[in-house]
């Protein structure tokens, strides 16, 4: 066997392993939050970025082995930004044989008309885009709207709200839309961005640049993203543990009187969540809780339940 064949064989092995991990992550998120149900018609919002391409690919893959029946329709909003490659997504989706709809709305022109030069356009653009996608979901008769946000996006949102908003609020894997008419799901909620990036690179998706509108990146979010990436490099397992913390909230040991009845504590009240250790500090694990090095993931695979019959 030639050296090139050896490399190709290794690359394929790594891609299969990566795809299996992404499928498992998505399958677990779907099961944990009951994201997809029998007969669902899912509107997959496709921007042309790595996240939405990966979401569509994994959902299509799971569709073949899932114990329930559901359908997918990919939707892209062409906002008429200068230089937007209109042919890329239709060609890609037709090649896959995926049902799709390209919605053409000149939101770019509206934003440029309403927002003074030099001011950020993201807020108005987001509101316009959201309204159009909600309308499209109704027109297509879809039961769920799938967005491509991943675990890193969720953590970034948590820290943005903590640092700048004064609240512990992240990005929900599943919730009712703000208009009260649609269920929004995020199937990539358990997926790492670095896994998605590696998968997108290996699959060579036809990526569409995200800066066509000319807007500047969200500086606050970028600072948080850089901070999390730095932590991930310097302290392996910290990101995983922080995300686990979002799934293991202990209201009695926080300060929100809406979540826990502190005023109702009297002599004779039951001990809740271990009670207060008073002067003693809580014992903290030396290693991040629940984290395993990446090379140990084969062992973890044997212990986890493949909820969507990943093969």
From Swiss-Prot:
A motif (PP-loop motif) lies at residues 47-52. Its EC number is 2.8.1.-. Transmembrane segments: none annotated. It is found in: Cytoplasm. GO terms for cellular component: cytoplasm. GO terms for biological process: tRNA thio-modification. It catalyses: cytidine(32) in tRNA + S-sulfanyl-L-cysteinyl-[cysteine desulfurase] + AH2 + ATP = 2-thiocytidine(32) in tRNA + L-cysteinyl-[cysteine desulfurase] + A + AMP + diphosphate + H(+). Binds 1 [4Fe-4S] cluster per subunit. The cluster is chelated by three Cys residues, the fourth Fe has a free coordination site that may bind a sulfur atom transferred from the persulfide of IscS. Signal peptide: none annotated. Belongs to the TtcA family. The thiolation reaction likely consists of two steps: a first activation step by ATP to form an adenylated intermediate of the target base of tRNA, and a second nucleophilic substitution step of the sulfur (S) atom supplied by the hydrosulfide attached to the Fe-S cluster. Homodimer. This is tRNA-cytidine(32) 2-sulfurtransferase. It comes from Shigella flexneri.
């Amino acid at each position: 066997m030639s050296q090139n064949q050896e490399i190709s064989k290794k690359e394929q092995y790594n891609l299969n392993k990566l795809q299996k991990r992404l499928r498992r992550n998505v399958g677990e998120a779907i099961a944990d939050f009951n994201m997809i149900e029998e007969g669902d018609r899912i509107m997959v919002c496709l921007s042309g970025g790595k996240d939405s391409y990966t979401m569509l690919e994994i959902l299509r893959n799971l569709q073949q082995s899932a114990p329930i029946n559901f359908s997918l329709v990919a939707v892209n909003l062409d906002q008429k930004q200068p230089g937007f490659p209109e042919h890329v997504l239709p060609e890609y989706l037709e090649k896959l044989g995926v049902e799709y709809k390209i919605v053409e709305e000149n939101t770019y022109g509206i934003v440029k008309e309403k927002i003074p030069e030099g001011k950020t356009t993201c807020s108005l653009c987001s509101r316009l885009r959201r309204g159009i996608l909600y309308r499209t979901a109704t027109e297509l008769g879809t039961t769920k709207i799938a967005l491509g946000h991943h675990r890193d996006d969720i953590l970034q949102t948590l820290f943005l709200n903590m640092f700048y908003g004064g609240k512990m609020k992240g990005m929900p894997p599943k919730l009712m839309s703000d208009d009260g008419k649609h269920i929004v799901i995020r199937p990539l909620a358990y997926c790492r961005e670095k896994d998605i990036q590696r998968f997108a690179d290996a699959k060579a998706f036809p990526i569409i640049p995200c800066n066509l509108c000319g807007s500047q990146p969200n500086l606050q979010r970028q600072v948080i993203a850089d901070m999390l990436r730095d932590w991930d490099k310097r302290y392996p397992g910290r990101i995983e543990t922080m995300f686990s913390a979002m799934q293991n909230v202990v209201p009695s040991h926080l300060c929100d009187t809406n979540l826990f009845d502190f005023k109702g504590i009297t002599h004779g009240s039951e001990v809740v969540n271990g009670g207060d250790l008073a002067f003693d500090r809580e014992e903290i694990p030396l290693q991040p809780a629940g984290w395993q090095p990446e090379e140990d993931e084969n062992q973890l695979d044997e212990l986890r339940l493949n909820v969507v019959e990943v093969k």
